[in-house]
Amino acid sequence: MKIIAVANQKGGVGKTTTSVNLAACLAARGVKTLLIDLDPQANATSALGLPTIDGHSIYEPLLGGAPISEKVVPTRWEHLWIIPGDLALAGAEIEVARADHHLTRLRAAFEPLRADATFDFVLLDCPPSLGILMTNALAAADELLIPLQCEYFALEGLSKIDHVV
């Protein structure tokens, strides 16, 4: 299982568009793909035509309250599943920050999924900030994809995320 974080601390650079389209392309090729919407705005979730579903975000797995596998929701596309985003993820930043191992909780939550080899790829659609959700995604990821636009502030955001990594 390969985990790819799609991240940039700057908003509006195409993280969600990249995440959703890459997930759809992988699924269309028969690759078992899980898209995790880590953004409280839940745009990846709505892009796939799904509503937010109470209790089905990454919130509880981040806090150790439930395994990731219980939060996976099928989409209408074969080979593509999602863990929807939810506004409650904004509160997860505060709760996870108080927890032990707060920067590696997502990586630990993925261990059972890696062992089961349920998915070939996991794509993490990150929020536009350098907060706890993004740092957990970076710690959990095998690869990092940083979309950016050809403008000064996008490059500035790239240098900030490079410093964090």
Predicted regions and their residues:
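P-loop NTP-binding core
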Residues: 1-165
